[in-house]
């Protein structure tokens, strides 16, 4: 009927059809019908829409649609219509799924029902029953599918309800030979759809719910939907309309009709990519198919299903071998079988007995004969080939024999070496000297400045007492290194008045002594009191050692006391000997006197070593040599000190030694040196006398104190003993010979080097000390060699016999015996401390002793008499035995006492015994907090700051309310801890462990018990707060901060194998490889005739062979020397923050950084829901100014590199690479703001440019809130290009210099070599202060000033510039401008505000109508007055440069807050560690300070944050800003831990000091930060402490603000901790702030007053209560009529303000009295609080009711309360507009009562009568206290009189 209706011409045919029964007749009718339809189509307009709708209504009747034509045009249209009708449920989808759409061009066989020949048994009836349980993936591809054997089907238990596969049929087939039954399921459209969509979503095929649509799976991302549907269109051709809204199952059914049963173009490409990228060489698609067939019994068609699904679970990296690939396929088959609900068994697990039957036995002799014959043939073939190629194999044999002989000889030598020496000796002589690793220190001048500031910081009230400064030797050390800039610093300290007694005199004395010190050489002075050893047995039986003062505390007096020699002569403990005629060394009194004089000078005036050059070996920690070096540095010497440890580990010890001890002119070079190595001895001396000598090419003194401890007997001497002997004897002599040789060659005869030869009193008496005595005895031969050798003109010998020295590393094991030694045999021997022995040796290095040594060798006996102990070993053994015995007795007594107590009390200790309390384990819990800044009280502010109340327009003052960062050291808090503490706090360890995924929070049952707390992420065991440091410190330090690049964090990028592409030309044809047809065609297109392509037999794959002459790119890897970076802590995961997985997969990593930072920044501002902002501001008033230097580098890498390499890349990657995309994601997922998105790109100065843009937006009023900051990532491309510019530090070069990764960023140092890249993000939430106060948000700091600047003409983009000098631009007139005076500006502002209020009075008088003041008039007057006042505040407070541009912008911004350029105490420097930047930056800052007149001696403390964090580029300025705010809040200035030696070029900049350690600076007022970016981006910002803003607030306003902030902190801390525990710090918004409705959006965007939920303080806006409206009117009138109160600190005539205000209001009322009575009247009164006579009881009783008096007396300030009520009574009386009965009339009839804190008016007596007579029904009153005055306004409302 449908055809008859649409095509009337067919009516005869159609009408005749029902009557027909003959098949032939039906065919004839069908033929006629077809002809008529074709004729109609050709002759008349086609009505295909109606035709389709009509035909598709009868799916039960019409099941086959056949298009006659060359293409599937109409059929495609019909399929789309059918799919659309199914999705809209017009017709049942199950009915439409049975339809067939065929075309004569493609489906001839099906149209004519031509079936292929079938084999096997027919399908049994039971098979149909199992069809319903089979999965949909097994659906037949078409009606032509061959019938095969039935498979056993099981339902997988692992299938979830959401993803459980639907049913399908599985025909049966014969059982394979292996014994397993494998169903034959051909590839269907469903398989392909599932595989392609799962691959696109990066999920496994069994994780995709097929009941969902593409639209649902993509989460509404239109680009992703478009990409998927585009790929499906390439694969299948035409798709159903609205295919993205069709469930995947139905979509597969809809596409099945024309599916050819094999992968199409897109799927083939994905399979090819899987094979080429992940499979091992040679394991192609055919190999995969063969394995599936042989191992699992898959047919070719069924195997295609598994191969297609493989693209969804591809391995992370290329599989190494074919076995690995087969294992991968086996795992995939198991997973597929579970998903499809089928059971599969590998054939190898079936019946294998047949395999054994096929084994063949071969006779062994026959096999050996075959092998022998084959070998003979191969040898003959080799000989023929050698002859043909003219190769002499015999000659090769001779060479081989020679090599073997040489090898044997070497082995024999090694055997002899090993038999004579051992591995300890061999490794012990290894050379370690490397001139590149020498550390040189000469920046004593900077440490002098730092010491001066530290010393002065302790000379303030409440700091350390004066005597403590003297005891620590701080003053003496400072005077040693005094320089002119130190005098400036002290003088400034005295001039500013910060110094108070008793420190005032001390500072002045230091200044005087410093002036004297400049005229003298620095000296070493020995001031240590003499101590003696004491060993006691404690009450617990432990042997305890200590040192106590000697009776004779004078060390010099002790030495002179001496011993009585055998001759009866008293010999000092330290004395000199000379050789007697009998060749024996005798005490020499004359020379000893010279030594004692030197010692006396050293303990008095001091010894100077200025200009002397010294080499000291063996100066490790706790050594005599180290103490000697300290003394030499104190005396101003130039020292070379050697270390056998790695320089990186030893440098910190020596650097601290230099920083603490170096005097003026002192230098120190630390040299790696192995004294047991001959090569090192030679290299060291060559270095000393070479071109780069740190001691000017010669030595004055040589102190070879290097030693190796030994503890072996003669019977056990080994290689270590020989090594020690070599170091302590042989190589000392070698060094002397090398020095002599160098001096002789240079003719340095007149300057002999004095050698302090280390001798000992131990010449074998100790025993068990190896060859140590022999080494020392051998050195004594030098005394004789001096005369027999030829070097006496170049070297002088002074032998120093060292006595018993306490506390050295070598004597640690015997330090307990010191007291026994001193009393041994009654000899009265003395032992020495390290400092005492070092003093003795330093006395030997004085000019007088040196002159004595030039006359001949000198023997210095420094043994203290220990040499006289003959039986020292016995003495030591007896002492040990005594200690052991006494200790044992004491322990036995202790045990006995414990036993007694146990018997008596049942415990080991008596109940009242508290002498030895048991240690208690720490149970302190960490407290995670966002660390809100403290808000001081008004009284605290008044004590330290000027009062700025009313002086600043807070609506145009920019403050930071929240900030956050993500970098190498985690967040801002953990970075700050590392920066100023060099360690993490307990809270810091917890946060870092959480960030790195080491722990997680657990709440539930653990080991069967309820548990809430932290657990280890791997072991799931509980971790107590106190255990975090112990468990995780090593891991955190190894995987955070600056470190070697971890390839796992960068997608496999390994700098040691940096990849490049090398173009090559093929010289010989390459072996063929298989690939898809599409790839084969692509190779032919690229290589042309240089490639041969042919199809593989019985396969869809093609063989490709690259021919000779083809050229293409081959990857290669080269080592890259930038292998250190500041990556995010290993283990950081955005999912842990709560970012959805689909977002993580979609966006670039920098976007994830920003999202994490924004969420935490909001919490640090106390904002849990960002939409809360829109309760206070319009959605268009939030600006997003996040910027970046390089943008989404990972996305760019995928866009260019991976796309070029044909890797899988998301289709919308281009949008992710845009520089503004990150800011867009932040807005889409967090803010939903319609404010501007501004994306600054300022290279390394991006964050400051962003801050500048945000501040401009807020100050201009275009925005009230701004999100600012910057971000950048670390990627290999940028890293390489930075290296090409020589901007970054070479990690290879740094390692060669002995630098560890954490040391490679060294801003401002002599050895800096470029910056170290890092990655991260920094974000701040800024807003105007007025809004921040209203919302109760924490104010971290004030952004007082920001500026960006370009630079000069040039050709270099990276060149540092000086454009930001313009921030200090100022003329001489501006320097002394009166506008810089706060008092002057306050007076001018007060005048303008008074004028505004006079104008308000006039306007109110002019606009008052019969019914009072219209609301609109009040609105206009109020707005205008407020605008005028704010304009005045801005002109006289915020921006004084608008009146006088000659004032410097920096000065003007500081003057706003009552500060000067001298109040800036810290500068956070860009400090990149490049040569050019660090010197340029210091120069710019110094010029600015000089030009602005900063006081000399008031240096800025430089903070170089990049020493810790590296250089994050875009985030650099943000991290600096965070550091500045943290300094202002804590009063701590962090040091630059890597500043081991400040560049001497920076010494000229006296306005800057570079501290190495953190320095306390309480009450920091302001900080400055500078930033410089490539491309002429110079930035500067000034940050002021928030307390200066609080000083501009009224006391009640500040207190209310404090309460709001405290509440926010509690809520924010709770939300932060909860977010960490639940992994939900980030919460993506699903709905815009206005909801889902477009109409709601339009209303909000078009209404400037639209707010979310109404303003929190105006929630009753819809309340029509008249009382509420009247209250509002009174408050507004009060604000309009009251001028701003003057600060209490400003002097003004008494009563002037009150009189002026009263007069103005009286004038207004007088002008109104002539008008007729109206419905509203107003009364205003201002009273001085002090005018209320509180002592006059009569006055109080006459004018105040009893309840009023009770209320006032109960208030904290009764007088102010009485004054408020008195003023209100006066205002009410005036509002009644009745004649006064006199000034003495009582006012008790007007009663002011308090109703919940709101004043209410009650009238009595005559006052009430007057009110009733005038028709007054209601009187409202408002009372305002301010300073010393109180003001009241009353509004009386009455009915109009007729």
Swiss-Prot record:
Its EC number(s): 2.3.1.86, 1.1.1.100, 2.3.1.41
Biotechnological applications listed in the UniProt record: As colorants, MonAzPs are widely used in various food products for centuries. Moreover, MonAzPs also possess wide-ranging biological activities such as antibacterial activity, preventing hypertension, lowering cholesterol levels, causing hypolipidemic effects, and displaying antiobesity and antitumor activities.
The Carrier domain, residue ranges: 184-262
GO biological process: long-chain fatty acid biosynthetic process
Ligand binding (Mg(2+)): 1725-1727, 1824-1825
Beta-ketoacyl reductase, as annotated region: 611-807
Signal peptide (from-to): none
Upregulation: Expression does not seem to be regulated by the azaphilone pigments (MonAzPs) gene cluster-specific transcription regulator pigB.
Catalytic-site annotation from UniProt: 1244, 1470, 1511
Protein family membership: Belongs to the thiolase-like superfamily. Fungal fatty acid synthetase subunit alpha family.
Subunit structure: [Alpha(6)beta(6)] hexamers of two multifunctional subunits (alpha and beta).
UniProt name for this protein: Fatty acid synthase alpha subunit pigJ
Organism: Monascus ruber (Mold)
């Amino acid at each position: 009927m449908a055809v008859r209706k649409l095509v009337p011409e067919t009516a005869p045919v159609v009408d005749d059809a029902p009557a027909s029964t003959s098949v032939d007749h039906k065919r004839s009718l069908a033929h006629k019908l077809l002809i008529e339809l074709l004729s109609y189509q050709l002759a008349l307009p086609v009505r295909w829409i109606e035709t389709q709708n009509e035909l598709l209504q009868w799916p039960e009747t019409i099941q086959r649609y056949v298009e006659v034509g060359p293409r599937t045009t109409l059929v495609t249209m019909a399929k789309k219509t059918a799919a659309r009708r199914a999705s809209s449920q017009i017709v049942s989808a199950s009915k439409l799924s049975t339809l067939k759409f065929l075309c004569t061009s493609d489906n001839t066989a099906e149209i004519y029902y031509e079936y292929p020949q079938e084999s096997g048994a027919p399908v049994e009836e039971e098979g149909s029953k199992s069809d319903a349980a089979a999965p949909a993936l097994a659906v037949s591809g078409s009606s032509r599918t061959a019938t095969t054997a039935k498979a056993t089907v099981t339902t997988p238990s692992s299938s979830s309800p959401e993803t459980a596969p639907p049913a399908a049929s599985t025909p049966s087939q014969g059982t394979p030979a292996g014994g397993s039954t494998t169903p034959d399921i051909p590839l269907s459209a469903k398989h392909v759809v599932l595989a392609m969509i799962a691959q696109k979503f990066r999920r496994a095929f069994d994780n995709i719910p097929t009941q969902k649509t593409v639209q649902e799976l993509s989460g509404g991302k239109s680009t992703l939907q478009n990409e998927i549907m585009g790929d499906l269109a390439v694969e299948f051709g035409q798709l159903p309309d609205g295919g993205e809204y069709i469930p995947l199952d139905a979509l597969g059914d809809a596409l099945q009709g024309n599916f050819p049963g094999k992968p199409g173009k897109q799927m083939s490409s994905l399979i090819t990519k899987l094979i080429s990228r992940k499979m091992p060489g040679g394991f192609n698609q055919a190999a995969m198919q063969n394995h599936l067939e042989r191992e699992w019994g898959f047919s070719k068609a069924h195997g295609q299903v598994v191969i297609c699904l493989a693209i969804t679970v591809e391995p992370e990296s290329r599989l190494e071998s074919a076995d690995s690939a087969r294992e991968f396929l086996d795992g995939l088959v198991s997973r597929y079988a579970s998903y499809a609900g089928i059971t599969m068994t590998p054939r190898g697990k079936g019946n294998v007995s047949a395999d054994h039957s096929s084994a063949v036995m071969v006779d062994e002799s026959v096999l050996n004969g075959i092998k022998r014959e084959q070998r003979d043939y191969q040898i003959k073939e080799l000989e023929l080939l050698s002859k043909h190629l003219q190769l002499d194999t015999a000659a090769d044999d001779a060479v081989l024999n020679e090599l073997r002989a040489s090898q044997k000889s070497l082995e024999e030598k090694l055997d002899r070496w090993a038999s004579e020496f051992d591995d300890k000796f061999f490794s012990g002589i290894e050379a370690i000297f490397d001139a590149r690793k020498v550390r040189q220190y000469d920046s004593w001048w900077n440490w002098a400045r730092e010491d001066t500031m530290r010393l002065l910081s302790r000379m303030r009230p409440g700091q350390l007492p004066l005597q403590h400064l003297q005891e620590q030797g701080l003053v003496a050390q400072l005077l040693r290194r005094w320089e002119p800039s130190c005098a400036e610093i002290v003088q400034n300290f005295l001039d500013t008045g910060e110094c108070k007694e008793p420190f005032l005199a001390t500072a002045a004395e230091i200044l005087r002594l410093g002036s004297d010190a400049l005229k003298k050489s620095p000296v070493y002075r020995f001031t240590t009191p003499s101590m003696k050893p004491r060993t006691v047995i404690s009450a617990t039986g432990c042997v305890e050692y200590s040192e106590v003062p000697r009776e004779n505390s004078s060390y010099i007096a002790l030495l002179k006391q001496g011993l009585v020699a055998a001759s009866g002569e008293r010999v000092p403990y330290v004395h000199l000997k000379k050789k007697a005629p009998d060749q024996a060394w005798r005490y020499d009194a004359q020379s000893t006197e010279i030594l004692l004089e030197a010692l006396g000078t050293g303990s008095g005036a001091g010894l100077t070593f200025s200009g002397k050059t010294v080499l000291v070996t063996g100066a490790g920690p706790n050594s005599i040599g180290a103490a000697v070096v300290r003394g030499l540095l104190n005396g101003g010497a130039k020292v070379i000190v050697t270390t056998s440890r790695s320089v990186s580990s030893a440098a910190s010890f020596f650097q601290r030694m230099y920083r603490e001890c170096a005097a003026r002119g002192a230098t120190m070079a630390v040299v790696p040196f192995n004294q047991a190595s001959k090569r090192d001895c030679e290299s060291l001396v060559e270095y000393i006398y070479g071109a780069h000598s740190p001691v000017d090419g010669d030595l004055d003194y040589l102190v070879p104190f290097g030693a190796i401890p030994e503890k072996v007997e003669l019977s056990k001497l080994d290689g270590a003993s020989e090594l020690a002997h070599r170091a302590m004897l042989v190589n000392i002599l070698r060094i002397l010979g090398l020095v002599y040789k160098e001096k002789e060659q240079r003719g340095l005869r007149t300057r002999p080097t004095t050698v302090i030869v280390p001798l000992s009193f131990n010449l074998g008496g100790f025993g068990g000390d190896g060859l140590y005595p022999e080494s020392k005895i051998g050195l004594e031969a030098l005394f004789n060699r001096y005369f027999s050798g030829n070097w006496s003109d170049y070297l002088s010998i002074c032998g120093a016999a060292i006595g018993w020295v306490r506390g050295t590393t070598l004597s640690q094991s015997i330090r307990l015996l010191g007291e026994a030694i001193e009393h041994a045999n009654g000899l009265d021997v003395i032992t020495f401390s390290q400092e005492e022995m070092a003093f003795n040796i330093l006395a030997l290095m004085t000019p007088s002793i040196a002159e004595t040594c030039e006359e001949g060798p000198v023997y210095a006996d420094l043994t203290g008499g220990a040499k006289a102990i003959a039986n020292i070993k016995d003495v030591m053994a007896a002492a040990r035995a005594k200690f052991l015995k006494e200790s044992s007795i004491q322990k036995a007594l202790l045990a006995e006492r414990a036993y007694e107590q146990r018997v008596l009390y049942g415990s080991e200790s008596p109940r009242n015994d508290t002498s030895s309390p048991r240690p208690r384990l720490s149970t302190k819990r960490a407290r995670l907090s966002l660390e809100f800044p403290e808000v001081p009280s008004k009284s605290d502010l008044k004590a330290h700051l000027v009062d700025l109340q009313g002086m600043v327009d807070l609506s145009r003052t920019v403050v930071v309310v929240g900030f956050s960062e993500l970098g190498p050291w985690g967040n801002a808090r953990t970075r700050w801890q590392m920066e100023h503490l060099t360690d993490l706090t307990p809270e810091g360890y917890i946060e870092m462990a959480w960030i790195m995924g080491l722990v997680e929070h657990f709440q539930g049952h653990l080991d069967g018990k309820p548990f809430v707390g932290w657990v280890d992420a791997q072991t799931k065991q509980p971790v107590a707060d106190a255990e975090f440091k112990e468990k995780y410190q090593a891991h955190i330090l190894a995987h955070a901060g600056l470190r070697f690049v971890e390839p796992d964090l960068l997608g496999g990028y390994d700098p040691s194998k940096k990849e490049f592409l090398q173009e090559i030309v093929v010289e010989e044809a390459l072996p063929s490889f298989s690939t898809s047809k599409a790839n084969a065609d692509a190779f032919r297109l690229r290589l042309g005739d240089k490639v041969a392509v042919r199809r593989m037999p019985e396969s869809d794959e093609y063989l490709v062979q690259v021919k000779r002459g083809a050229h293409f790119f081959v990857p290669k890897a080269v080592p890259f020397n930038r292998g250190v970076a500041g990556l995010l802590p290993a283990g950081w995961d955005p999912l842990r923050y709560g970012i959805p997985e689909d977002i993580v997969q979609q966006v670039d990593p920098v976007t994830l950084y920003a999202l994490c930072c924004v969420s935490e920044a909001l919490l640090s501002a106390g904002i849990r829901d960002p939409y809360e902002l829109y309760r206070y501001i319009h959605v268009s008033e939030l600006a997003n100014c996040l910027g970046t230097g390089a943008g989404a580098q990972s996305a760019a890498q995928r866009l260019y590199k991976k796309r070029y390499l044909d890797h899988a890349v998301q289709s919308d990657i281009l949008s992710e690479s845009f520089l503004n995309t990150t800011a867009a994601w932040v807005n889409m997922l967090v803010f939903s703001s319609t404010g501007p998105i501004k994306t600054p790109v300022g290279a390394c100065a991006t964050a400051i440019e962003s801050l500048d843009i945000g501040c401009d937006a807020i100050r201009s009023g275009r925005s009230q809130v701004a999100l600012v900051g910057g971000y950048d990532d670390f990627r290999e491309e940028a890293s390489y290009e930075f290296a090409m510019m020589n901007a970054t530090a070479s990690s290879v070069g740094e390692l060669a210099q002995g630098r560890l990764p954490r040391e490679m960023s060294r801003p401002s140092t002599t050895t800096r070599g470029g910056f170290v890249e890092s990655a991260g993000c920094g974000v701040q939430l800024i807003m105007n202060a007025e809004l921040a106060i209203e919302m109760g948000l924490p104010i971290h700091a004030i952004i007082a000033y920001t500026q960006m600047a370009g630079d000069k003409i040039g050709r270099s983009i990276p060149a540092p510039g000086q454009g930001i000098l313009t921030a200090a631009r100022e003329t001489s007139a501006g320097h002394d401008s009166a506008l810089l005076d706060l008092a002057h500006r306050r007076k001018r502002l007060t005048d303008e505000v008074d004028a505004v209020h006079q104008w308000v009075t006039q306007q109110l008088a002019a606009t008052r109508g019969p019914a009072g003041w219209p609301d609109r008039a009040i609105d206009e007057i109020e707005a205008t007055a407020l605008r005028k006042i704010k304009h005045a505040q801005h002109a006289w407070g915020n921006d004084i440069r608008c009146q006088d541009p000659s004032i410097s912008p920096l000065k003007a911004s500081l003057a706003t807050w009552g500060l000067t350029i001298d109040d800036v105490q810290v500068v956070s420097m860009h400090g990149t560690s490049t040569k050019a930047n660090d010197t340029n930056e210091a120069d710019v800052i110094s010029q600015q300070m000089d030009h602005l007149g900063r006081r000399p001696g008031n240096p800025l403390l430089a903070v170089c944050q990049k020493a810790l964090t590296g250089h994050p580029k875009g985030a650099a300025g943000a991290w600096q800003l965070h550091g500045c705010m943290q300094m202002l809040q804590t009063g701590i200035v962090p040091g630059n831990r890597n500043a081991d030696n400040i560049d001497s070029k920076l010494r000229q900049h006296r306005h800057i000091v570079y501290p190495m350690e953190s320095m306390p600076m309480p009450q920091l007022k302001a900080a400055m930060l500078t930033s410089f970016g490539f491309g002429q981006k110079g930035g500067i910002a000034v940050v002021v402490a928030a307390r200066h803003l609080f000083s501009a607030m009224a006391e009640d306003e500040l207190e209310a603000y404090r309460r709001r902030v405290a509440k926010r902190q509690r809520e924010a801390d709770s939300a932060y901790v909860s977010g960490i525990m639940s992994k939900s710090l980030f919460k993506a918004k699903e709905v815009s702030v206005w909801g889902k409705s477009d109409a709601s959006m339009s209303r909000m965007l078009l209404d400037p007053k639209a707010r979310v939920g109404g303003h929190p303080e105006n929630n009753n806006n819809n309340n029509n209560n008249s009382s509420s409206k009247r209250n509002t009117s009174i408050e507004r009138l009060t604000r309009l009529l009251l001028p701003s109160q003057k600060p209490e600190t400003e002097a003004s005539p008494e009563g002037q303000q009150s009189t002026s205000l009263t007069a103005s209001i009286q004038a207004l009322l007088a002008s109104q009295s002539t008008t007729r009575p109206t419905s509203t009247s107003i009364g205003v009164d201002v009273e001085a609080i002090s005018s209320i006579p509180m002592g006059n009881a009569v006055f109080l009783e006459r004018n105040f009711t009893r309840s009023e008096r009770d209320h006032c007396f109960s208030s904290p300030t009764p007088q102010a309360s009485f004054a408020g009520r008195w003023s209100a009574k006066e205002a009410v009386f005036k509002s009644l507009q009745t004649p006064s009965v006199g000034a003495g009339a009582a006012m008790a009839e007007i009663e002011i009562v308090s109703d919940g804190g709101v004043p209410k008016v009650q009238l009595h007596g005559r006052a009430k009568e007057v009110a009733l007579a005038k028709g007054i029904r209601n009187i409202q009153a408002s009372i305002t206290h301010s300073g010393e005055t109180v003001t009241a306004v009353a509004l009386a409302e009455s009915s109009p009189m007729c």
